[in-house]
Amino acid sequence: MFAVLPVLLALAVLLGSCTAPTACMEEATAFRAALCNAGGCSFQAEITADHGDYTTTFTLQCRYDTQSGALDFTVAAPESISGIAGTVDTDRKTITFAATALETPLLAAEKLAPVALPQVLGESWAGSYIAQAGSDHAYTVVLYQNGYEDDTLQVETWFSEGAPVYASIWYDGVSQAGVKLSDFQLY
């Protein structure tokens, strides 16, 4: 299980190294506006979910719709489950599979399925509270707070040239997953 220290270090980066915090916040809000105006995005997400004593890694091809808040996905890797497709609704509790269903251990105190993580990302980018925005010299890092009270997820997203390239998702001070993002496109 990941310790709380990485969150504190990331926050130190956000607070300490950005020479123009206003510019970083403007970049975060410009990304949100572009995403919402486009109506959605597509991306590949390589997810490493932390289950405490072990991790699982899988890759999804994703399509997030800002209007409905739903995410369509197709498993790209590992090959043994490649091709499984489904939809994650906005409540993250309803996952509809096209044919074969996946069963994975839940994250965030048994409240979040790993295949729902990209939906959390899309929802955060499109409308969650932007708590911090800063720079670590090569990337703009934005911290979103997704949810309320006991159900709040912290979503850190690293942007390069205006597109998300990595995200980490935290619940109650504990890392739940890291997500490498590629092939990001607005549609």
Please place each PLM-identified region on the residue numbering.
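Short, exposed beta-strand/loop patches in secreted or surface proteins that constitute
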Residues: 33-35, 60-66, 86-88, 126-134, ...
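Gly/Pro-enriched, hydrophobic low-complexity segments
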Residues: 72-74, 127-187
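Extended beta-sheet lipid-handling architectures
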Residues: 42-45, 57, 88-90, 167-172, ...
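Flexible, processing/modification-adjacent segments and terminal tails
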Residues: 36, 47, 95-150
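N-terminal leader/targeting segments and the immediate start of mature chains
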Residues: 16-67, 80
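An acidic-aromatic
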Residues: 61, 65-119, 174-177
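Short acidic, glycine-rich loop/turn motifs
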Residues: 45-53, 75-77, 97-101, 143-147, ...
